[in-house]
Curated annotation (Swiss-Prot):
Keywords: Heme, Hydrogen peroxide, Iron, Metal-binding, Oxidoreductase, Peroxidase, Sporulation. The gene is katE. Signal peptide: none annotated. Residues 1-43 are annotated as: Disordered. Residues 1-27 have a biased composition (Basic and acidic residues). One of its GO terms (molecular function) is metal ion binding. This is Catalase-2. Its cofactor is heme. InterPro entries: Catalase, Catalase_AS, Catalase_clade2, Catalase_clade2_helical, Catalase_core, Catalase_haem_BS, Catalase_immune_responsive, Catalase_large_C. The active site is at residues 78, 151. Its EC number is 1.11.1.6. It comes from Bacillus subtilis (strain 168). It holds the Pfam family Catalase_C.
Length: 686
């Protein structure tokens, strides 16, 4: 193996490489891009104080020209994104399954860069729209960059990449008026769904709570496609990739998501940024599902169909490692905007399958980067550079940074001893899996891809009653925005193939006739792994609004705040005004927000500490009432209990914890923390 391949990476390898490109203007004199010091930056060069600007003003020309060209084309999809750095560690050697080097040594921390994104909206759209979320990970391995380019939903709308432009044209704003932004609640999207029923399964996921995640830190990630693991002996297995968030999978409610879009359009990116800035870690475990080659046709679904998942009860997920995200980016444009992911960026031991959507993506990603990043050398942009050296005969082109020495730029050659020379498998060279392929040229999908509804039914049947009601409400909202009654009827008809009761509820909600009920299958299949009801629940990293005013109880508040801090809960003190408030015993407390600057939708729970000042405050009442209606935990003590009663008409119920004149507020604190950890109290009667 060459010296290049012997170089070990660690969690800091990428950061150390990026350090070569960082610059800090603090304490520096201003210069032009050519290094010439600038003496004036507020006035252009003119002929007299009121005269015309002179063309010889090179500083003005350079400054304005650069400004005019600052923006690059935004991504056609996944335009709004946010990135973060971290590292990945495998738990145990995966030698039995793959030769991928980064999956062998548990002591190695492979640096990663992750970009989370929405799909449909433009770069300036809101974070909390109903949509799939992108979850793309770039591993900077010793063998080159490996990109796992996935979503937070394990399936996709279409089966063949040739339909991708049609899908995107359908869900993007309608071209005649460029509306609506970052939303699928319009005619063209649902017309596409009605006439392309392969999308039914993915639509069920996007209409579910998965379409409005609470946080990037609390959503799963999936590779979507079927790939291959190949080991040293050449044995291959089909594989699907999963990211499992350590905090569990949690979502917003739709009313809350819409309000957050107005109150804080940056809600998800702010949540991620602040968590890491405050010293927190964002963690996901990497899992794989594997199927032996000889079992390819063992199942009642085609394992290469991207509109199908592999039920975890049939093909268990093997957890193989953990990713820790722990460093924010230094510059969003240089990193998040310029990063270029590609499902074709693989390393030895990971290979492709004949998934027709994956095959098309292998072309499309390179093609789109060429125009977005200005040419074929985007791999030299710092965030995209591998941490291992690269050597080939790809020369020149726009923005070339590498200075290639010598006269040889071709293969084979004798002038340079045939260097750079191909590497054998033993030397780390990538060898494609030798799959036998035969068939006649044909534009047709396999009959095994024609089952559009079985897994959509599986998803529906696996939902809890609350999750089902959320799906129904989402359909009624989205399809209710459609102007064409004909399209509405078609949508109802399509989803009558999934569940008759679901179709009937949608029909009722949008005012069309329900189709005749189809004969229901006697066998009702479920997959418990698909429901969020069974997810991990913890109070760690949750965000609590503490409502307090002058006259608050010092002992009570100190006890509760310390308990929340011990659980890793973030607290904001909210009051009528910014500045300090005073307890009954004279202790001061500073407010970090007011009822004008923040809102209950930005928090996971509310603790009404009270104080005489807030007892009859209508803004405080509205704050609590909204949290109550969104099924959040509410704690109240002393005067806060009166505030709670005035807000929602009760001081009892699911997720409500109260205490008055307690000698010790430890028990109250614990009960409130448990209520926060539950995420939402869905059985609360609103």
């Amino acid at each position: 193996m060459s010296d290049d391949q012997n170089k070990r990476v660690n969690e800091h390898s990428k950061d150390e490489q990026l350090e070569q490109y960082r610059t800090d203007n603090s304490g520096k004199k201003m210069t032009t891009n050519q290094g010439l010091r600038v003496s004036e930056d507020e006035h252009s060069l003119k002929a007299g104080v009121r005269g015309p600007t002179l063309m010889e003003d090179f500083h003005f020309r350079e400054k304005m020209t650069h400004f005019d060209h600052e923006r690059i084309p935004e991504r056609v999809v996944h335009a709004r994104g946010f990135g973060v750095h971290g590292f990945f560690q495998v738990y145990e050697p995966m030698t039995e399954y793959t030769r991928a080097k980064f999956l062998q040594d548990p002591s190695v921390k492979t640096p990663v860069f992750v970009r989370f994104s929405t799909v449909a909206g433009s770069k300036g759209s809101a974070d909390t729209v109903r949509d799939a979320r992108g979850f793309a990970t770039k591993f900077y391995t010793e063998e080159g960059n490996y990109d796992l380019v996935g979503n937070n939903i394990p399936v996709f709308f279409i089966q063949d990449a040739i339909k991708f432009p049609d899908l995107v044209h359908a869900f993007k704003p309608e071209p005649h008026n460029e509306m609506p932004q970052a939303a699928t609640a319009h005619d063209t999207f649902w017309d596409f769904v009605a006439n392309n029923p392969e999308s039914a399964h993915m639509v069920m996921w996007t209409m579910s709570d998965r379409g409005i995640p609470r946080s990037y830190r609390m959503m799963e990630g999936f590779g979507v496609h079927t790939f291959r693991f190949v080991n040293e002996q050449g044995k291959a297995r089909f594989v699907k990739f999963h990211w499992k968030p350590v905090l569990g999978v949690h979502s917003l409610v739709w009313d809350e998501a819409q309000k957050i879009a107005g109150k804080d359009p940056d809600f998800h990116r702010r949540d991620l940024w602040e968590t890491i800035e405050n010293g927190g870690k964002v963690e996901y475990e990497l899992g794989v599902q594997m199927i032996d080659e000889e079992d390819e046709f063992k199942f009642d679904f085609d394992i290469l169909d991207p509109t199908k998942l592999w039920p975890e009860e049939l093909v268990p997920v093997k957890i193989i490692g953990k990713m820790t995200l722990n460093r924010n980016q230094d510059n969003v444009f240089a990193e998040t905007e310029q990063v270029a992911f590609h499902p074709g960026n693989v390393v030895p031991g990971i290979d492709f399958t004949n998934d027709p959507l994956l095959q098309g993506r292998l072309f499309s990603y390179t093609d789109t980067q060429l125009i977005r990043l200005g040419g074929p050398n985007f791999h030299e942009i710092p965030i995209n550079r591998p941490v291992c050296p690269f050597h080939n005969n790809q020369y020149d082109g726009y923005h070339r940074m590498t200075i290639n020495k010598g006269p040889v730029a071709y293969h084979k050659n004798s002038l340079q001893n045939n260097d750079p020379s191909p590497a054998t498998a033993e030397e780390g060279g990538y060898v494609h899996y030798q799959e036998k392929v035969e068939g006649k040229k044909i534009r047709q999908r396999s009959d095994s891809f024609n089952d559009y509804y079985s897994q959509a039914k599986l998803f529906w049947n696996s939902m809890s009653p609350v999750e089902k009601q959320h799906i129904i409400s989402a359909f009624c909202f989205e399809v209710g925005k459609v102007k064409s009654k004909d399209v509405q009827r078609q949508v109802v008809d399509v989803f009558s193939n999934v569940d008759a009761d679901l179709a009937e509820e949608i029909a009722k909600g949008v005012g069309v006739a329900a189709p005749a009920k189809r004969k229901a299958s006697k066998e009702i299949l479920t997959s418990p792994a698909l429901s969020q009801a069974r997810t991990v629940k913890t109070a760690s990293t949750r965000k609590v609004a503490v409502l307090a005013g002058n006259g608050f109880h010092e002992k009570e508040l100190q006890t509760v705040l310390e308990a929340l801090k011990q659980e890793g809960i973030t607290v904001d003190i909210i009051s009528q005004n910014l500045g300090y408030m005073t307890s009954g015993s004279g202790q001061q407390l500073e407010a970090s927000g007011t009822f004008l600057t923040v809102d209950s939708v930005l928090y996971d729970a509310v603790y009404a500490a009270g104080g005489l000042e807030l007892k009859d405050n209508k803004q405080a009442m509205a704050f609590i009432r909204e949290a109550y209606n969104h099924y959040k935990a509410i704690g109240a003590a002393n005067e806060g209990i009166d505030l709670l009663q005035s807000s929602v008409g009760t001081t009892e119920g699911l997720g409500i914890v109260t205490a008055k004149d307690e000698p010790d507020y430890t028990a109250f604190s614990k009960a409130f923390i448990d209520a926060v950890a539950a995420h939402r109290h869905w059985d609360r009667r609103i």
